Amino acid sequence: MKKRRQGPINKRVDFLSNKVNKYSIRKFTVGTASILVGATLMFGAADNEAKAAEDNQLESASKEEQKGSRDNESSKLNQVDLDNGSHSSEKTTNVNNATEVKKVEAPTTSDVSKPKANEAVVTNESTKPKTTEAPTVNEESIAETPKTSTTQQDSTEKNNPSLKDNLNSSSTTSKESKTDEHSTKQAQMSTNKSNLDTNDSPTQSEKTSSQANNDSTDNQSAPSKQLDSKPSEQKVYKTKFNDEPTQDVEHTTTKLKTPSISTDSSVNDKQDYTRSAVASLGVDSNETEAITNAVRDNLDLKAASREQINEAIIAEALKKDFSNPDYGVDTPLALNTSQSKNSPHKSASPRMNLMSLAAEPNSGKNVNDKVKITNPTLSLNKSNNHANNVIWPTSNEQFNLKANYELDDSIKEGDTFTIKYGQYIRPGGLELPAIKTQLRSKDGSIVANGVYDKTTNTTTYTFTNYVDQYQNITGSFDLIATPKRETAIKDNQNYPMEVTIANEVVKKDFIVDYGNKKDNTTTAAVANVDNVNNKHNEVVYLNQNNQNPKYAKYFSTVKNGKFIPGEVKVYEVTDTNAMVDSFNPDLNSSNVKDVTSQFTPKVSADGTRVDINFARSMANGKKYIVTQAVRPTGTGNVYTEYWLTRDGTTNTNDFYRGTKSTTVTYLNGSSTAQGDNPTYSLGDYVWLDKNKNGVQDDDEKGLAGVYVTLKDSNNRELQRVTTDQSGHYQFDNLQNGTYTVEFAIPDNYTPSPANNSTNDAIDSDGERDGTRKVVVAKGTINNADNMTVDTGFYLTPKYNVGDYVWEDTNKDGIQDDNEKGISNVKVTLKNKNGDTIGTTTTDSNGKYEFTGLENGDYTIEFETPEGYTPTKQNSGSDEGKDSNGTKTTVTVKDADNKTIDSGFYKPIYNLGDYVWEDTNKDGIQDDSEKGISGVKVTLKDKNGNAIGTTTTDASGHYQFKGLENGSYTVEFETPSGYTPTKANSGQDITVDSNGITTTGIINGADNLTIDSGFYKTPKYSVGDYVWEDTNKDGIQDDNEKGISGVKVTLKDEKGNIISTTTTDENGKYQFDNLDSGNYIIHFEKPEGMTQTTANSGNDDEKDADGEDVRVTITDHDDFSIDNGYFDDDSDSDSDADSDSDSDSDSDADSDSDADSDSDSDSDSDSDSDSDSDSDSDSDSDSDSDADSDSDADSDSDSDSDSDSDSDSDSDSDSDSDSDSDSDADSDSDADSDSDADSDSDADSDSDSDSDSDADSDSDSDSDSDADSDSDSDSDSDADSDSDSDSDSDADSDSDSDSDSDADSDSDSDSDSDSDSDSDSDSDSDSDSDSDSDSDSDSDSDSDSDADSDSDSDSDSDADSDSDADSDSDSDSDSDSDSDSDADSDSDSDSDSDSDSDSDADSDSDSDSDSDAESDSDSDSDSDSDSDSDSDSDSDSDSDSDSDSDSDADSDSDSDSDSDSDSDSDSDSDSDSDSDSDADSDSYSDSDSDSDSDSDSDSDSDSDSDSDSDSDSDSDSDSDSDSDSDSDSDSDSDSDSDSDSDSDSDSDSDSDSDSDSDSDSDSDSDSDSDSDSDSDSDSDSDSDSDSDKNAKDKLPDTGANEDHDSKGTLLGTLFAGLGALLLGRRRKKDNKEK
């Protein structure tokens, strides 16, 4: 806004070309500047926000807005009293609501350049709350910003589009406007400014800083922002030296008559424009026409835009060879303007005019997204007593809009951001929003210039170069706003108030109450305060309450103001909706009619009264709106009264009810008067002063990108610009006065000497302002432009410091020619304050240098290299050769300093000692102990890198030489045959052993204490004896001799063979030269001998240790490892070839009582894989009544692949309890093919103790028909201990055709507990037809401990009938392969009472591969109680056709514990009807690495009722395909827990065809030890009677062999006859039963 200079109030200054011809507001201010009460934007820290220079306090209200009038008014006012014309005073509460607006001027910010703005708020007369409105940011544009020559230019161009005046007018001016950092900046500095661009661009924009200091232009830095360094507490300055910013020209004061054109203009207008633009370049008329014609010829003027014409002018102008240096150009965008300043008023050169064409205004981009808004709030500045969500706008209540912000460092000068107001809110308070505002920093610097657009209700802020000068800019907003009366028109209506700051939205609802009292005849309010035009706009509603006065006169008076003639209007209301509550009626609508001419308002000569005679116009109900404007004239409150009376006076009581007055109060106001203010320009030039003389020389060029700030006499910032490409700058629209111009000192530049010439136009005016990084110059405007304020800078000279770091080998402190530099030494440079400003390292030659240093004092510090020591300093007289030490001070004074050097030397030492043989192993060197020569010693640095290797000398000494201080590692290699002695024994480090690896430290001295001791490693022997243990007791007896030639193998603990030997003739063996450790000794069993019992007795040196013995040698020999063997008892080798065809009929009656106690401990590890394919067809008819109590614990892991076709019919009742723990590791490959046909009748009673190892291959084909009745009583006690490790791969294909007819009656009660782990792959095809009727009663409890390994291959054809009673203790190892085809028909009745206790502990590891194919037809009925733990993997494919008829009544109590892990894929179709009561505790832990593809197709129809409690642990992987059709009908009633003694009489009809008839009666008690390997195919007919005793003969019974044979034969015959008779009798008895 423009301020008029001080002068006579009534002086009229004519409309001069460079003066503002407008009625300014409150001109001729008294020492202070005013600010519009509007949007206030404050920058800086939130707790210390900057305030605008002036605070305006406005208080406004209309009478009807006053709280008192909002309540019921007094009875006096409720009636119309036409006779009472007296007015009420401001303080009368009962009469009117008055609003008082008080404007407060800040005491410290008077501004000679900006007139004061009048702030206004209507105050109710009776109550005058003094509400202070937050100050606006920009006094200039808010109070009043005359449009100066911009408006004139626009107007001129619009009204005179074809003017062709001379473009070189000496009175025109132009103002530069800068946009983007990378666009060209060009300003026209002289009074003669030629402007072809008629666009009015905004003023310079700027941005705030969070730093609260006044040095807004203190520093100016490099062209681009230092994004890598953003200190939060320090301003970073930036200078744009080498940029070519695009100029944005704002033509604010120009009288160019250049026609204004657009694309749609005519060709003639465009040609006139071209001619005028070319003329502005200052060329003669010939050249003007030539360029104009060239543009016309080369360009389609009809379609060309103004920009295209400008480009064509530039192109043509550049083609001409101008001799005039004023318009000669190098390039259109890089002008070199170097000219002497001979006149204080410089005209813009033709080259600058050409630049104007090339640099059209280029506005920046919107950066709303880079303005970060936080904590936005919208609150009410309440000054009356009402609800918090209600605002009284006519009482000058306002909204406070606050927010914090942060500006992104990428924002450039010319960029913009917006504050958008919503539909029902606008900026400012009672005053109209200012068109132009300024955003200032906390220290008053201009950060951005704002322009308010009423159409879009948006303020757009354009950043100034402040954002280029500083980084990390933060601050806060504090604005005021008010309801928008054009849209928020109703009282007591809720409106959403919304404002968008950048991209951040703040929104809140408020109720708006303007206080329109519709029951009053007169209601008035101040609609707004127009500070731009210095007036108050008032609105009066007449006859709003339909009182319809018969005769009325309206008049209004004002104090401290004058009514503006021509602005008093009268409108007749045709629609009452026009009388809006907001006192902002739309006077252009059809709801009102302008009837001013009918009533002719009269304004008094002094302007303080207006009269309107309505006469009788209101009598018929017409309503009127009166609008009037008041211009303040004094410093007091503007007080306006409104009257509607009969006679137009205040002398009667004939006044009508209504508002009587409003008051606008100004505090610290000033008088105003109308007039025009001349304005001028100030500026000049910033140049590069190459010769540093402070005077502009012809060859010295301008400096671009220098920040220039203009301040008033109170040091308040007014404007800021940046020098253009030619170094020029200019400030426009300035009034007379003295100003301060601040130039920011660019980085790496120094200000030139000031005032070094008597010619002010060419010398440098800027002087350094203390420690601030600015130079300051004064500029005075006295009725003319001042274009002499310039300043020069020169590049700050830089110097270098450095020298040399060397190794001072002779330690004399002086550099010698043969001494070399040390590389990579760290050197640090510090300033006089001790701050590090540079760090470097020496190069490969030891050189270093710091460059670019200014004059001053510095400190240089050298870091001592590792392993070096600083040499002595300042030796000798040659400063260039001595050492300055590790820290020295250097002064730079207009020259380089290359004498700062430092020397270091490297001290070296020795490390070593001694390696000795520590014969007594005490870890200390004794005098008698000697050194060990030839020991390898390795030296390593601290990083583990080997740096030296040596060996001990003849005396055991070693040494490493030439070592620097530091830590080293010494490693001793253990000599062959030696062992390291113990380390660090005793207190004397010089004689102890440091071990084989130790650390040696050198610290300024030799270290000769690193030694190591070793002693010879002892060797040991192991061995003893292998003997024949004739008495088999496992203990060496004196008479038992050694066995020679036995192979003994020595292995390490991992089983690797170390050595092998054999026993000598005495059975002795020995292994020597063994170290301490763990070993395995293996004895290979001599052929034909058996391992004796191991570890018998208590004498380890006398017992046998077994075949594999683990031995630990610990510092001593071990001669206790021996083993014994004995010969096998019998060795039989039989080769029998027998072909027998026997037909025997035997009737045997045997009664056997067997009591067996077996204790079996087996360790088996088995791995079996079975694949079975079975096809079964089962037809069962069972009648059973079972009461079973079964306790089963099963753990099964099965992997089976079976395909079975079975037809089985079985009836079994078994109760078995077996506890078996087996560990078996078996690997078997059995291929058995046996064909046996034997017919034998043997009766043998033998008691044998045999240990046999049989390898037999038999092929037997037997056909037997036996009818036997046997009663046997056997008592057997078997104790076998077997440990089998077998790996079996069995591929068996058996084809068995068996036809048996068995009639058996068995009743058995068995209790078994089995734990089985099986993996079988079998392929069996079996066709069996059995009809068995068995009745057996057996109670068996068996405890068996069996260890068997059998390998048999037999081919026998035997038909045998045998009755045997045997008591055997057998340990057998058999491998059998048999193929048998048997057809037997047996009828047996047996009564057995067997009591067996079986405790089996087996650990089995078996790997078997069996392929079995079976076809079985079975009919079975089973009742079993089993506790089984099985691990099976089965893959079965079964096709089962079962027809069973079962009627079962079962009471089953089963407790099973099952742990099963199964992976099955089954497809089953089952129809089951089951009633089950199951209590099961199932813990399933399956780690099944089994690939089970179980495809099960089953069709089963079963009806079962079971009560089972099962706990099973099974792991199964099954693949089964079964088709089962089962039809069972069973009716059984059985209760079996029986121990029965069965006497059976059997009649057997046996047809046997046998070539041999053998009758043998053998009673043998044999203890045999046999090892047989037989392969026999025998067809034998033998009759033998033998009695064998391998070692000890049986007691003589008194009978010879013949008697024995005969007795046996006769006994047999009689026994057979008796058995036959007995069998027939029993059979008969059974039948009768």
Swiss-Prot record:
Propeptide residue range(s): 1598-1633
Membrane topology reported for the UniProt record: Peptidoglycan-anchor
Main location, first listed in the record: secreted
Keyword Transmembrane helix belongs to the record: no
Region spans: Type I collagen binding region: 679-1129
Residue ranges occupied by any CNA-B domain in the UniProt entry: 679-797, 798-907, 908-1018, 1019-1129
Chain intervals for the UniProt region annotation (Disordered): 51-269, 862-889, 1085-1608
Subcellular locations according to the entry: Secreted, Cell wall
Residue(s) carrying Pentaglycyl murein peptidoglycan amidated threonine: T1597
Signal peptide interval: 1-45
Motif window: LPXTG sorting signal: 1594-1598
SUPFAM superfamilies per UniProt: Bacterial adhesins, Hypothetical protein PA1324
An example Gene Ontology CC term for this record: extracellular region
Comp. bias (Polar residues): 85-99, 146-168, 186-226, 255-266
Top-rank lineage group of the source organism: Bacteria
Keywords: Cell wall, Peptidoglycan-anchor, Repeat, Secreted, Signal, Virulence
Disulfide bonds: none
GO terms classed as biological process: cell adhesion
Cross-referenced Gene3D superfamilies: 2.60.40.1280, Immunoglobulins
Family label: Belongs to the serine-aspartate repeat-containing protein (SDr) family.
PANTHER family in alphabetical order: CARBOXYPEPTIDASE REGULATORY REGION-CONTAINING, COLOSSIN-A
Domain notes per entry: Each CNA-B domain is able to independently mediate adherence to the substrate.
NCBIfam families cross-referenced by the UniProt entry: LPXTG_anchor, YSIRK_signal
Name under which the protein is recorded: Serine-aspartate repeat-containing protein F
Annotated organism of origin: Staphylococcus epidermidis (strain ATCC 12228 / FDA PCI 1200)
Gene: sdrF
